[in-house]
């Protein structure tokens, strides 16, 4: 078959077909990638510098994000920090509290403007996802958090008798809703965060027996999946004051995946931003540690990590100076644990078959 080499004729035909598509489907239905300025992905900070680094800058705007892990691992805390960051920039946030467990006092302590936070506590999964879809389509809301997928109970299950079998109902509900919501998210630029719980597969011999609720659709549609785990309890003497958590970027469509970040979550206060800063400053060589002592430019500033964090709390100008130097080092390509890629496991690379739940 001969190839048409008439460049001007091809360009004229291309212009005509592009105009026809735009008339039929609306402006922006098709575009050159170089012209699509909104394709440059903007991000939302998670409140943890190490996690932002592992994500390639933060949570991407206008995408579906899944945060999953065991109970009390910090899933809701990370989502509330993202809401606080959006509100600081003047954005509007919504929280769909399907678990009926939102603590306004704790949210306020994390920096969330609870007076202007939109909150919904729907009775059924259908209601919750319809509310999410309407908020997304309005293009007036910048971030929506759903807590959690496991609590999105289908209407048939609520209205049915205890003990009735409802096989695959929630998976089908999530699959239908995500097909509808995802297209609207792309047009409105709203970020949607689904918080999810873990369950155990029965009879698994090889690989991880853990799986998330709601079927496979969310795994497929999510641009970012964060696996968050508690790895250590922080104590002062016998008193527990927080958790050390590890977050693995199990999936990332906008930056390299499989990176791992660690940070502290302090009870009643949320993510320890200065704790992240101390860790990154040590890894980049800005703060040197010899034994238990931390030093800066040859001068000892504190003994122990907790005292180093306290020192930065008392000297915000010095903390900002350290932060700027850390950013400069990272911009020049400094390699730290949060921006190096961890080895993928079998679960991360599993194929997702949506046909199973249709």
Curated annotation (Swiss-Prot):
Pfam families named in the record: RecA, RecA_C
Leader sequence segment: none
One of the GO BP terms on file: SOS response
Alphabetized SMART domains for the sequence: AAA (SM00382)
Subcellular location field: Cytoplasm
Keyword Kinase annotated: no
SUPFAM superfamilies linked: P-loop containing nucleoside triphosphate hydrolases (SSF52540), RecA protein, C-terminal domain (SSF54752)
GO cellular component: cytosol
Principal localisation: cytoplasm
Matches recorded under CDD domains: RecA
Keywords (A to Z) from UniProt: ATP-binding, Cytoplasm, DNA damage, DNA recombination, DNA repair, DNA-binding, Nucleotide-binding, SOS response
Stored Gene3D superfamilies: P-loop containing nucleotide triphosphate hydrolases (3.40.50.300)
GO molecular function, one term: ATP binding
Binding positions (ATP): 69-76
Coiled-coil annotated residue ranges, if any: none
Function: Can catalyze the hydrolysis of ATP in the presence of single-stranded DNA, the ATP-dependent uptake of single-stranded DNA by duplex DNA, and the ATP-dependent hybridization of homologous single-stranded DNAs. It interacts with LexA causing its activation and leading to its autocatalytic cleavage.
Family that this chain belongs to: Belongs to the RecA family.
Name of the protein in question: Protein RecA
Organism whose genome encodes this protein: Trichormus variabilis (strain ATCC 29413 / PCC 7937) (Anabaena variabilis)
Source organism phylogeny: Bacteria, Bacillati, Cyanobacteriota, Cyanophyceae, Nostocales
Gene that encodes it: recA
């Amino acid at each position: 078959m001969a190839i048409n080499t008439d460049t001007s004729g091809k360009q004229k035909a291309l212009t005509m077909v592009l105009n026809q598509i735009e008339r039929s489907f609306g402006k922006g239905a098709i575009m050159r990638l170089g012209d699509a300025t909104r394709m440059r992905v903007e991000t939302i900070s998670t409140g943890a510098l190490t996690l932002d680094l592992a994500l390639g800058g933060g949570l991407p705007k206008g995408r579906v994000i899944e945060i999953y892990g065991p109970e009390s691992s910090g899933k809701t805390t990370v989502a509330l920090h993202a809401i606080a960051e959006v509100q600081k920039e003047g954005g509007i946030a919504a929280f769909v509290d399907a678990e009926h467990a939102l603590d306004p006092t704790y949210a306020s302590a994390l920096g969330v403007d609870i007076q202007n936070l939109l909150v919904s506590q729907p009775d059924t999964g259908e209601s919750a996802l319809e509310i999410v879809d309407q908020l997304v389509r309005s293009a007036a809301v910048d971030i929506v958090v759903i807590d959690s997928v496991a609590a999105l109970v289908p209407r048939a299950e609520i209205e049915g008798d205890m003990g009735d079998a409802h096989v695959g109902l929630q998976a089908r509900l999530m699959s239908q809703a995500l097909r509808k919501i995802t297209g609207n998210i792309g047009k409105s630029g709203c970020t949607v965060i689904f918080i999810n719980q873990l369950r155990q597969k029965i009879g698994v011999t090889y690989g991880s027996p853990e799986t998330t609720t709601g079927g496979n659709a969310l795994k497929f549609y999510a641009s970012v999946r964060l696996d968050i785990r508690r790895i250590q309890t922080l104590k002062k003497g016998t008193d527990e004051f927080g958790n050390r958590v590890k977050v693995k970027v199990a999936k990332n469509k906008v930056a390299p995946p499989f990176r791992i970040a660690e940070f502290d979550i302090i009870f009643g206060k949320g993510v320890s931003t200065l704790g992240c800063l101390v860790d990154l400053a040590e890894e980049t060589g800005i703060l040197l540690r010899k034994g238990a002592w931390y030093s800066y430019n040859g001068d000892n500033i504190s003994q122990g990590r907790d005292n180093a964090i306290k020192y930065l709390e008392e000297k915000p100008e010095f903390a900002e100076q350290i932060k700027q130097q850390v950013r400069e080092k990272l911009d020049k390509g400094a390699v730290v644990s949060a921006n190096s890629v961890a080895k993928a496991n079998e679960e991360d690379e599993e194929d997702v078959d949506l046909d199973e739940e249709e």
